[in-house]
Regions:
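Peptidoglycan cell-wall recognition and remodeling modules
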Residues: 15-109
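Membrane-proximal envelope biogenesis segments
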Residues: 1-19
Length: 109
C-alpha cells in the first residue's frame, strides 16, 4: 500500500475545447439530430429518459429553459415545437459544447 501512495503512477489531463464561436453549420445539426433520433422531434428513448430530436433529459431541458426560455420550463421536450427544440439545443451547445451528446456530438465542431 505504501508503495502505491509513494509512486501513484501516470495521470490523465482532460482538456476541454471551446465550441466553435461561429457555431455548427446546418448540416452538422442535421447529422446530430439524425444520430440522436433519426431526426424525429417526438422521439423518446427506450427508457423514457431522453426525449425529442436532441434527446434531452427533462432535467437538462428545464435547466436550459430556466436560463433562457421560461415558457418552456415543464414542457416535455418530445412535445415541444421543432423550432423550440432547435433553440434549446443551440443554447445547450453554447453553454457546454458538443460533450452534452457523448456519442453523436462528434458531428458538431
Amino acid at each position: 500500500r505504501q508503495a502505491v501512495l509513494d509512486n501513484p503512477g501516470p495521470t490523465t489531463t482532460i482538456v476541454a475545447t471551446e465550441p466553435d464561436p461561429k457555431g455548427p453549420k446546418k448540416y452538422q445539426w442535421e447529422a446530430l439530430k439524425y444520430c440522436e433520433s433519426t431526426g424525429n422531434y417526438q422521439a423518446v428513448s427506450p427508457t423514457g429518459n431522453y426525449r425529442g430530436a436532441y434527446q434531452f433529459s427533462v432535467e437538462t431541458w428545464n435547466w436550459i429553459a430556466g436560463l433562457y426560455y421560461e415558457n418552456l420550463v415543464g414542457v416535455d421536450p418530445a412535445a415541444a415545437r421543432p423550432q423550440d427544440q432547435d433553440r434549446m439545443a443551440e443554447s445547450l451547445y453554447l453553454l457546454r459544447g458538443r460533450g452534452q451528446w457523448p456519442v453523436c456530438g462528434r458531428y458538431l465542431p
